[in-house]
Amino acid sequence: MWKLKIAEGDKNSPYISTTNNFVGRQIWEFDPNAGTAEELAEVEEARQNFYKNRHQVKPASDLIFRLQFLREKNFKQTIPQVKVEDGEEITYDTATAAMKRAAHYFSAIQASDGHWPAENSGPMYFLPPFVFCLYITGHLDTVFTAAHRREVLRYLYNHQHEDGGWGIHIEAPSSMFGTVYSYLTMRLLGLGPNDGENNACARARKWIRDNGGVTYIPSWGKNWLSILGLFEWAGTHPMPPEFWMLPSHFPLHPAQMWCFCRLVYMPLCYLYGKRFVGPITPLIKQLREELHTEPYDKINWRKVRHQCAKTDLYYPHPFVQEVLWDTLYFATEPLLTRWPLNKYVREKALKQTMKIIHYEDQSSRYITIGCVEKPLCMLACWVEDPEGVAFKKHLERIADFIWIGEDGMKVQTFGSQTWDTALGLQALLACNIVDEIGPALAKGHDYLKKAQVRDNPVGDYTSNFRHFSKGAWTFSDQDHGWQVSDCTAESLKCCLHFSMLPPEIVGEKHDPERLYEAVNFILSLQDKNGGIAVWEKAGASLMLEWLNPVEFLEDLIVEHTYVECTASAIEAFVMFKKLYPHHRKKEIENFLVKAVQYIENEQTADGSWYGNWGVCFLYGTCFALGGLHAAGKTYNNCLAIRRAVEFLLQAQSDDGGWGESYKSCPSKIYVPLDGKRSTVVHTALAILGLIHAGQAERDPTPIHRGVKLLINSQLENGDFPQQEIMGVFMRNCMLHYAQYRNIFPLWALAEYRRKVPLPN
């Protein structure tokens, strides 16, 4: 039986380190002897229910850890379930009952160290590179046990489409990228070419070959296939490591890139520069025959470089990019790979690149910035020294990425511990029932204090192209180390709330100096347009986006500013200014003026705001309205708010709720769900937005209708149903935030009960 372990790690191991006793760490362990017959039956029932409905509801309900926590805490919902009939008014007591039921359930799924665990996954290309790397290095059997393999295969079977393929994420239609990666994972884990549940391998292979074969995989996939020996490096776009040797202010230096882009390029250019290829095993030779539509030795690699399946093509390469690739391919690379430049330039560039890889690994305790970078950095360390300490330290941190759900084993982005906790705590605080949920609040407060980043990246971080991190909060845990603006703003809001509550209930307030450090970090990220970025300050030319090599994502070359992050910062600063009016007073006031103007400028023609990190216009609009409301804007004095209210009211469905398709994100146009279905998360976001906009004072009817849907959707134990996927990044790839279905409905019910007049 699988069990989630919290804040655990071998403190005596020379291959793993921590900055705060592993607070926030969440790892899964399999114990074949654990679990009663009843517990095992519960888990199996959850798996079977997901399987039966897998084509209707793609994201898992994250029940494996929830069942465990609810058992361990002996949770029983004691507040009777409530429903609102047609024509019936929602009373204060009804709203209170629904809110308390949600709050008690949510408190019960809190971890012992104070954070809220959850799945944060969804893309089908997160897991396979871990399998690829471990296969190449010979560690696949030791890291992924038979229990792991069963869960990986369960995940792939559950998310295989009826046409035999897989999308780039669990809700997307079949793609070459997702299908090739998933097929290779099954085969490397030991399935034969015609094995797998419901002929999984044969159906996947047919999809690949019917769509042109593996040469049509996007450029990112071509890189990993070259590493595996299923492709030739001559069939990929050049990634010269020499760019690291340019002056850092030069437009093509990686320092100008968005941090995730930079840190993918970093190990990839090392592997490319060495033309590294893993062992050509009999299985690799067989896979060459299975995946290509012509004999491997007959393929014209030069011609396949620019090929990409139509199913995967979201961002076509501009002409200027094709010219750059061809220049590097035909002119630059032939020079850099021949004597004397291969010895005096290429070797020096590779050493410089490896030095930066080691720096980033050490700064993140070998977690790295994310799951895409992790296996690449791990492999680069193995290529440098298969018996080296760096590679062994990487192996110890694989567990930090693994997540087990009723749909199987997947790989996380890197965990959303702090983000979910900061939002969840605000939802609980809004309930205004401190006496009932004091222990959950105190543990959450303690977690946030321990999760704040206390130091900057190690050594001379500016020479390694890093922004300062002291005072920030990460998306995941402190060991991860990567500062995030909105996680910092939302965590700061929590700490400020807690400072106004009785310390005997919620714990001592956070050290003001630590709060000042958080403010300093947020201030450092404001761009000249008034918005703030996520990880590092924006500023590189947006024209560099023309060089985006990833055909299925957009806006990933340079850092951008974001409405949601800016709105969170406004809310945090308005609250901070009231409690600490003297710290950087003038700078905060100037920040707020520019930030509000930025949000107003970013509003779309229909009155909404595009959500960059959530689906989509309902998500962005909720955050934007929260920021404007905090800054003192109202329906009467702000045209942007009036236009936003009009958008929200027009988007309301006949059932009283709201529901938006993930397709809004890539299309950049509001797309309702088929049949104008509603979801509890979108409904909650819209309710929060309308409350921010003062709709309760004008006409609360739309809010009442939305809350009725929330109350009637609540499950018997206080949970809410899992529905559509709710997160996104880079326009076209979705992320599953499993806690959103609890956080936002709870928050909406709490704000409704506090701010909307209700009959007793």
UniProtKB/Swiss-Prot annotation:
Active site feature: D486 (proton donor)
PFTB repeat coordinates: 99-141, 149-190, 441-485, 515-560, 592-632, 641-689, 703-744
Magnesium found in the keyword field: no
Tissue localization of expression: Mainly expressed in fruits.
Coiled coil: none
Single biological process term from Gene Ontology: triterpenoid biosynthetic process
SUPFAM superfamilies: Terpenoid cyclases/Protein prenyltransferases
Pathway of action: Secondary metabolite biosynthesis; terpenoid biosynthesis
Family annotation (Pfam families): SQHop_cyclase_C, SQHop_cyclase_N
Record's catalysed reaction(s): (S)-2,3-epoxysqualene = tirucalla-7,24-dien-3beta-ol
EC number of this enzyme: 5.4.99.56
EC top class, as a word: isomerase
Gene Ontology, cellular component aspect: lipid droplet
Cross-referenced NCBIfam families: squalene_cyclas
Purpose: Oxidosqualene cyclase involved in the biosynthesis of limonoids triterpene natural products such as azadirachtin, an antifeedant widely used as bioinsecticide, and possessing many medicinal applications including anti-tumoral, anti-malarial, anti-rheumatic, antibacterial, anti-inflammatory, anti-pyretic and diuretic effects. Converts 2,3-oxidosqualene (2,3-epoxysqualene) into tirucalladienol, generating rings and asymmetric centers in a single transformation.
Family statement drawn from the similarity comment of this UniProt entry: Belongs to the terpene cyclase/mutase family.
Name of the featured protein: Tirucalladienol synthase OSC1
Organism the protein comes from: Azadirachta indica
